[in-house]
Amino acid sequence: MPSFPWQKLGCDLFDHQGAQYLLVVDYYSKYPILMKLNSTTSAAIINHLKSIYAEYGTPESLVTDNGPQYSSREFAAFCNHWGINHITSSPLYPKSNGFIERMVQTVKNLLKKSDAAGQDPYLALLSYRTTPIDRNLPSPAKVLSQRDYRTQLPCSGRLQRSRPWNVTKSNYSIDKTSRNSSMTGNPHVN
């Protein structure tokens, strides 16, 4: 289990209404990044991951399935060059990467509901990112970036300037069934 944001990421591909998407999710904050793909080759996935890493930083580890995009020599060389520990789920039991599979279903539901309502799916994604995980826990965005994001919802300026969430003051749990201890020793929290 990760002990701070962006330490461990999950990555998967999925199809929605004939389009291919790349979903990258931080295991700690549950922050999802969604990218629509023109191609699902290793080279295309690597370019999207490079773009994400250039913006958010490089994770220590990346969990994927054993799809051809991730099992190529090109992908192995990329992970090695960028210093990323590439972890694959069991080819005999793909559900072993349950976290990312659940997030794929969550994001697919956001896309379906947005389509049905004729709404912008990226606003739905923003809403998901900025909704508190639990009544005592901050949003994925706040856990990851230590700030509240501005959204379409009216909000006082005071709330936009709120203090950063402190990991050491919370019993934040990624998966309550497998982890019940407090997060401490986070070098990324002020």
Positions of the model-derived regions?
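Retroviral integrase
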Residues: M1-N109, D134-L144, D148-N190
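Short, charged, surface-exposed loops that flank catalytic or proteolytic processing sites
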Residues: K113-L123
